[in-house]
Amino acid sequence: MISRWLLLIGLLALALFSQPCATEKAEPQINSTPFDHEPFFMSYFEDSDTILMLTTQRNLFRSFDGGKGWERVDDMDGKMKQHVVSVLQHPSDKDKAYALGSKGRHWITTDRAKTWNAFTIHQSPAIQHEPLVFHGWDSGKVIFQTDECIGTFCIVKSYYTTDDFKTVSPLRVSAGGCAWAVGHPQFAEGLNLEDQIRNRVLCVVSGLKVPAPYANRLVYSDDFFSNEADGAEMNLHQGRPVSGVQTTAAVKKFLVAAVKSQGTDEMALYVTLDTKVWHRADFGGHRVEQDAYTVLESTNYSMQVDVLTDQSSMTGVLFTSNSNGTYFTRNVEHTNRDRFGHVDFEKIADIQGIVLVNTVSNWKKLESDHRKKIVSEVSFDDGRTFQPLTVGDKHLHLHSVTTYANTGRVFSSPAPGVVMGVGNKGDHLKEYSECDLYVSDDAGVTWRHALDGPFKYEFGDQGAIIMAVSDKGKIGEIKYSTDHGKEWHTAKLQHEIFPKMLTTTPDSTSMKFVLVGSKESTGDGFFVYSIDFGSLHGRKCEKDDFEKWPARLNEDGEPDCLMGHKQFFNRRKANADCFMDEEFKDPQPIFEPCKCTAEDYECDYNFVRSEDGKSCLPAAPLVPPAGKCREKTDKFYGPSGWRLIPGNNCIREGGENLDKDIERTCEDTNGSPETHMSHKQVFDNSKQFSGQYFYLERQASSSGNDETVLMLTREREFWVSHDHGKKWEQPLKGVQIVAIIPHPYYSDGAFLLTGGQEAFWTVDRAYTFKSFKVPIPPTRDDMPVFSFHPQYKDWLIWTGAVDCGHGDCHSDAYITKNRGKDWDLLLRYVGKCEFESRKNRPDSENLIFCEQYANENKNNHKQLLSSDSFFADSHVHFDNEARYATMSEYIIVASHDPNNANSLIASVSVDGKTFAEAKFPPNVDVPVKTAFTVLDSSTHAVFLHLTMGVLKGAEYGSIIKSNSNGTLYTVSLNAASRDDRGFVDYEKMQGLEGVAVANVISNVDTVLKKGAAAKKVKTKITHNDGGQWMLLPPPAKDAEGKDFGCSNKDGKASDKCSLHLHGYTERWDSRDTFSSGSAIGLMMGVGNVGDHLTSKEEADTFMTRDGGITWKPIKKGRYIWEYGDSGSVIVIVPESRPTKILHYSLDEGDSWENFKFSDVDMLIHRLSTLPSDTSKNFLLWGKEQDSNQLATVNVDFSSLREASCKLVEDGQDSDDYYLWEPKHPLQEDNCLFGHIEQYHRKKLAANCWNNWREPHVHSIGKNCTCTRADYECDYNYEPQSDGSCALVPGLPKPDASIVCKEDPDKIEYPELLLGYRRIPQTTCMGGWEPPVVFKPCPGKEKEYKKKHSISGIGLFFAIVTPIAMASAAGYYVYTRWDGKFGQIRLGEDIGGREAILSRDSPLVAVPIAIIAGVVAVLKALPLLAISLWRSSSSFIRTRRDRAYSRPYASRGSFAARRGDYTSVVDDEDELLGVEDGEAEGEEEEL
């Protein structure tokens, strides 16, 4: 008995004394490593203890033991030290990582950082684009990208490797970067497309003609752009290419392309599963705007996208797509976002269907209260429904992505069901510092308090270990839990730190953690801690320590089904006293199938959800089976609209079968065409047509299909129609509106003025209007009241009247950045003020130009000022300015000549900082320059009309054209006609480069003697941007088949017989143009055939289909016209005479049909349609003959045809389209500006609609050799009657040797340069060029002679060797040739050895040519010395020209041959003059 007591006492003593040892062993092992510089990147290689860490000193470190030991990484050459700027790990290959260097040297590891191999690309990795783009199937394929950006314009150079950078090849230059079609391992999975898309690359490249983002194209190549340099365009929209592609993104099995058009903020998202078939994503009428959407973490069967809804409050709407990414359903309103696009959204890791989001509960009050009240919600059914987070009976709210204080995922990890977050109980989320740590071990169903205060946290050992560190100041300990956060233990750190980062392995299976912190809050000195819980020596979990845990529960607490199955995990019980101890082995889910329910189905293609979500409705009329639907009351069996979600594995037997065919009525199908094509509305209270109507053009990337028209009557009543005039409404009834001002850069917006300080705006296409106050009444001066910012739609400058009742009436300018909510005074005593921000002007976002009277006194002269600080300070450009105009990329200023107060000086700036005086051609003799008109300047040159004659009714001048910077001018066309207001009969053809029509006074001398009544006007056309002008060729017969009063045998124009058209100055409305930007090649006009233009009463209507080369009559008399559906329908109506009939053509004017649009005759004042001419609706404005009341008639042609034309974008014709090439009438080929363009034109017989919102160049076919048409006369030279350029009479020949003085190293100079310069747009190579004779620079005769001479021995061999070789070959052939010279042999077959010596053999033909050439060589000997150096210099020059002319390689794609190629837009004329006048349309008289 005593011995038993002794044994018991001994055991107790042993346990007592051994307890401290056991406690000591229970502590985690903690090691620290000091660093001088902050670690800012840390990442594990998956399924390993290997970590990469990058410090701010650009040193890369690695650890192979979970952070316990560190070593700096270097390559064999020792060049990695302090040169690594970023590190990226391969997303799908766990062995690979990439270190990108700062000096063109980069590194790759393929063995988890053990070894590093260098590769060289002599450029820095891209910053604004992804530097590395990975292939989803083959980890050896990577695209490396660099970028150079000026503002929003970037040049991206891409390189590619297919063998882990053992070899690197250039891919191409682009505007938005390149990506693999297979961007994710799940893309095209199971579609058997491996051979087709394995090497496919997609690139966002510049437009063929405009290097602006709205013209970007998405092209692809399957051979790395080796065979076809530009690639093929991707057909994104209904089988057609789309302009404005911004970027692409790989999202699981989806590939997404984002598109944005000019003139709208709205973006279109196009989605594909195979790169072949693309669909536009439908967000149920919700707008997706640029920089206002975020593609979130998505599933294998749907995408999650959050769309910004309120810029000021930063809230959004969460959408979830169907399985093909085309139709999106709204899940959550008012999601919380930040200004970087981050969204408070996270899917619980490895568990299907559970989502945590934060929303803003006080979103309605955010305009007055900027403090968001954020609440947290959770969904257990993939976002269909949401519920609050709860701690007991209290609501819990957690900080999420927008305020996350650690790396990696916010709430969850692969540890099944264990979720944590920092937050608080209550009605909304508090500041981070006021929150506590909470934990859930049932995937968010229930929560409990874990620790007081905010913490960083991580999960280990599949959730068996949770580690946390306080995030509230300096710490000296860590917290950890082994029971899902119920109880917490503490471990001390060796050094106190401010924690920066806590991390562990990505799969959360390890028991090792890494903590990074700084010694001080300022970041001076750093420690990296390795914390290993493996030292706790707990037992390994066994079978009884696990539970079968259901991942999701329904409202009844039962396991819930999602995608046709229930999901379970074998999970360690929270109170189990064991560790998993299975490093790098991920928890495996267990699935149990369910019977199919409605939740397992989605709407099929071409079906959309009903508003209640219970059925799928046809998105387009159904096509019934053959023989069905003879009557509307018939029925047929057709698709239900449902389909089983792809990837859903529910059990159909015993479940719902929603996708079986159902009985449908024939009312759901295509019906018979509508016969009621016209809709008339008479406005009872309107007696006069004011002419004020405006369309809100819908851009290609805009959703919806309304065609909105705004109209103002003479009685100041404002009307709106959203269906192109079929129905009208008065949204501001009773309010008198004096002006409608559409936003020039944002086609969904407009402003309405009342004449006082109340005004209205709309930004949603006139569906809603908001009132606002302008700071002062509108200006009384002749200038615009509004100026709009090109990039920021809410930035406005208002110019208003001040002190007009006190004798000092003047204008002040105010600015707003929030669409009139707040105004700030900009400048007093102003003239015109404008934003001058342009994409081609770096750092011009805040640049504003203003005219201001000196010393704020209107009696003083005007100054032109600029400021980029909203006039906190400013710069005076001109002290005595008359007016200024902004045209495309140029700012053109007219200032008073200090030597002649009645004369003007023109100055030009491209950058808005430096101005240069315009040098007018010396052959334009205008001693007193009283006025000049700025014409269209969209082709990188300024066109000016310089007034020379001001005789009333016979005003004229010279059209002069500048070089690319707008400073040096040459005469393009003399005696161009203008009117007394300064407007010019000049119009550029839309859609085609370099084509313009102008009217000239052909008998100026007679007019000066006899007066304006004697003037004769002729019409001329240019096809090379003003380089050459010619008369319009006359048609042979009139519209009735009769002869004209004159004719030409060859059909060409002559001085006695040509076609003449009434031009710009005779139009009622400046918007009525000859041509259309979408109806490529078409022009219409009213005029006559003869030796000059006659009155309008004698005019007929003519048309061209080939850009003005040939013309045909279409109707006798004057008609007004409009184009529709990109030219596939043309409507004309008689001008100024009563009618009830209009005429229309569906074949580009070959035939015409009549349509009766009214039962009574009407006098039509205007015929209008969308400015893009892409609508099938037309609107007639006028009045009934016996009434003075305004009436409108809508005519809708859409019912005439049903199908859309089918396009084949492979360079071939299709059934509906052919490729059309513009041409020059003086050239045999189709070269214009040095290249051949190809456009898709609808075949005349094709019975379909274009339905294409934007004109599209198919390709630039090829570059051409240069001809005379690629050159124009240089400064001081003028064109001659034979087309040559000659020095202006009386001017001395330019001293070409001045180049020798400017460059002392020059050896020679061009002694004779015949006055030509290349047209800026041309891309031609080689061919014709002006002859140049070079002479030696003074004192460089010896060098010149040495450069161009040939040595005696060289000359000898150059002559003798070819003759000797030719003679020997000739003798050999002569002795063996079957024919001999002069012999003819008939009927003999030639074969074997003799065939080599037959007459057709190259061996015979070539020596004979050489022998024949001997005589020529001998005759050419005297010229040999001259020709040798000339040919070599010509070769060098040609090579140089080719280098700089190479098209479409970088910035401008179409015009990369010029370094100053910039974004351009078409602008109307602006007149610069001394006298004030009345502005009309969009032109401005200065």
Curated annotation (Swiss-Prot):
<dbReference type="InterPro" id="IPR050310">
    <property type="entry name" value="VPS10-sortilin"/>
</dbReference>
<keyword id="KW-0677">Repeat</keyword>
<dbReference type="InterPro" id="IPR015943">
    <property type="entry name" value="WD40/YVTN_repeat-like_dom_sf"/>
</dbReference>
<feature type="repeat" description="BNR 2">
    <location>
        <begin position="378"/>
        <end position="387"/>
    </location>
</feature>
<comment type="similarity">
    <text>Belongs to the VPS10-related sortilin family.</text>
</comment>
<keyword id="KW-0472">Membrane</keyword>
<keyword id="KW-0732">Signal</keyword>
<feature type="repeat" description="BNR 3">
    <location>
        <begin position="438"/>
        <end position="448"/>
    </location>
</feature>
<keyword id="KW-0325">Glycoprotein</keyword>
<dbReference type="InterPro" id="IPR006581">
    <property type="entry name" value="VPS10"/>
</dbReference>
<dbReference type="GO" id="GO:0006623">
    <property type="term" value="P:protein targeting to vacuole"/>
</dbReference>
<keyword id="KW-0675">Receptor</keyword>
<comment type="function">
    <text>Functions as a sorting receptor in the Golgi compartment required for the intracellular sorting and delivery of soluble vacuolar proteins, like carboxypeptidase Y (CPY) and proteinase A. Executes multiple rounds of sorting by cycling between the late Golgi and a prevacuolar endosome-like compartment.</text>
</comment>
<feature type="glycosylation site" description="N-linked (GlcNAc...) asparagine">
    <location>
        <position position="1263"/>
    </location>
</feature>
<feature type="topological domain" description="Lumenal">
    <location>
        <begin position="1427"/>
        <end position="1486"/>
    </location>
</feature>
<dbReference type="Pfam" id="PF15901">
    <property type="entry name" value="Sortilin_C"/>
</dbReference>
<feature type="repeat" description="BNR 1">
    <location>
        <begin position="61"/>
        <end position="71"/>
    </location>
</feature>
<protein>
    <recommendedName>
        <fullName>Vacuolar protein sorting/targeting protein 10</fullName>
    </recommendedName>
</protein>
<dbReference type="GO" id="GO:0016020">
    <property type="term" value="C:membrane"/>
</dbReference>
<keyword id="KW-0653">Protein transport</keyword>
<dbReference type="Pfam" id="PF15902">
    <property type="entry name" value="Sortilin-Vps10"/>
</dbReference>
<feature type="transmembrane region" description="Helical">
    <location>
        <begin position="1406"/>
        <end position="1426"/>
    </location>
</feature>
<dbReference type="GO" id="GO:0005829">
    <property type="term" value="C:cytosol"/>
</dbReference>
<feature type="topological domain" description="Lumenal">
    <location>
        <begin position="24"/>
        <end position="1349"/>
    </location>
</feature>
<feature type="repeat" description="BNR 7">
    <location>
        <begin position="1144"/>
        <end position="1153"/>
    </location>
</feature>
<dbReference type="GO" id="GO:0006896">
    <property type="term" value="P:Golgi to vacuole transport"/>
</dbReference>
<feature type="signal peptide">
    <location>
        <begin position="1"/>
        <end position="23"/>
    </location>
</feature>
<dbReference type="InterPro" id="IPR031778">
    <property type="entry name" value="Sortilin_N"/>
</dbReference>
<keyword id="KW-0333">Golgi apparatus</keyword>
<feature type="glycosylation site" description="N-linked (GlcNAc...) asparagine">
    <location>
        <position position="300"/>
    </location>
</feature>
<feature type="glycosylation site" description="N-linked (GlcNAc...) asparagine">
    <location>
        <position position="965"/>
    </location>
</feature>
<feature type="transmembrane region" description="Helical">
    <location>
        <begin position="1350"/>
        <end position="1370"/>
    </location>
</feature>
<keyword id="KW-0812">Transmembrane</keyword>
<feature type="topological domain" description="Cytoplasmic">
    <location>
        <begin position="1371"/>
        <end position="1405"/>
    </location>
</feature>
<feature type="repeat" description="BNR 6">
    <location>
        <begin position="1102"/>
        <end position="1112"/>
    </location>
</feature>
<feature type="glycosylation site" description="N-linked (GlcNAc...) asparagine">
    <location>
        <position position="324"/>
    </location>
</feature>
<keyword id="KW-1133">Transmembrane helix</keyword>
<dbReference type="GO" id="GO:0006895">
    <property type="term" value="P:Golgi to endosome transport"/>
</dbReference>
<feature type="repeat" description="BNR 4">
    <location>
        <begin position="480"/>
        <end position="489"/>
    </location>
</feature>
<keyword id="KW-0813">Transport</keyword>
<feature type="repeat" description="BNR 5">
    <location>
        <begin position="719"/>
        <end position="729"/>
    </location>
</feature>
<dbReference type="GO" id="GO:0005794">
    <property type="term" value="C:Golgi apparatus"/>
</dbReference>
